[in-house]
Curated annotation (Swiss-Prot):
Catalytic activity: Endonucleolytic cleavage to 5'-phosphomonoester
Keyword Phosphoprotein on entry: no
Organism: Rickettsia bellii (strain OSU 85-389)
UniProt-recorded name of the protein: Ribonuclease 3
Keyword Transcription regulation among record annotations: no
Tree of life domain: Bacteria
Subunit structure comment from the entry: Homodimer.
Length: 227
């Protein structure tokens, strides 16, 4: 497991209360085994972090996308706070290397479990918020999510809706999605989905069917040169 100091460097933030950082990185499996002597895990912080992330992302969108109505803002926010996006942020921070977990959870693939990455990312957000203030966590989230906020088009945020709206505008049938393949086991699965519309077809992969469908739709939109 990597040192917490390395994570703080990546975040460009040093915790005043190191116990909050430890709590944010502690998997619930620790409390089920007395030998680890853990009395806290990340679950409560995850609950708070989810709310903090939604608030900050909402404020960023409100201030930076003045041309969009509330419906479009909601679509963008949904993309920015979804499991897939949060997991990408967590992966770029290398959070799997910092999670404190039992040996059993580790050998079961816990470090690569998207649920764990998502939960720890949200817990870390809450820990920073509690350790500092709303301005500090606002700046950190702004940096971590910058590449996702700056995509060029609304269709990038919601490719499935964009593809369906295009089909309807051309009087085509609605897109048909089909699961082609599932690889891996349980929480480490990779799904391959195809999307077909009026003779055009493209595939996409993801760690959930929903993510794979979005990626397939995005690829087909690119193929149709709509993005």
């Amino acid at each position: 497991m990597e040192s917490f100091e390395e994570l703080e460097k990546l975040l460009d933030y040093s915790f005043k209360n190191k116990a909050l950082l430890t709590e944010a990185l502690s998997h619930p499996s620790l409390r089920q085994h007395h030998e680890y002597k853990a009395n806290k895990d990340y679950e409560r912080l995850e609950f708070l972090g989810d709310a903090v992330l939604n608030l900050i992302i909402t404020e960023i969108l409100f201030n930076n996308f003045k041309e969009y109505n509330e419906g479009n803002l909601a679509k963008i926010r949904s993309y920015l706070v979804c499991k897939e996006t949060i997991c990408v942020v967590g992966a770029k921070l290398g959070l799997k290397n910092y999670i404190i977990m039992t040996h059993g959870e580790e050998i079961a693939g816990g470090r690569d479990n998207p649920n764990n990455i998502e939960n720890v990312t949200e817990a870390l957000i809450a820990a920073i918020y509690l350790d500092s203030d709303i301005t500090t966590i606002h700046n950190i989230i702004g940096k971590l999510w910058a590449e996702f906020i700056k995509v060029k088009d609304l269709t990038d945020y919601d490719p499935k809706t964009a593809l369906q709206e295009w089909a309807q505008s051309k009087d085509h049938h609605i897109p048909i999605y089909r699961l082609i393949k599932r690889e891996g086991v349980a929480h480490l699965s990779t799904f391959t989905v195809s999307v077909k519309i009026n003779g055009y077809e493209q595939t996409g992969k993801g760690h959930s069917i929903k993510e794979a469908e979005k990626n397939a739709a995005r690829e087909l939109l690119h193929k149709l040169k709509l993005l």
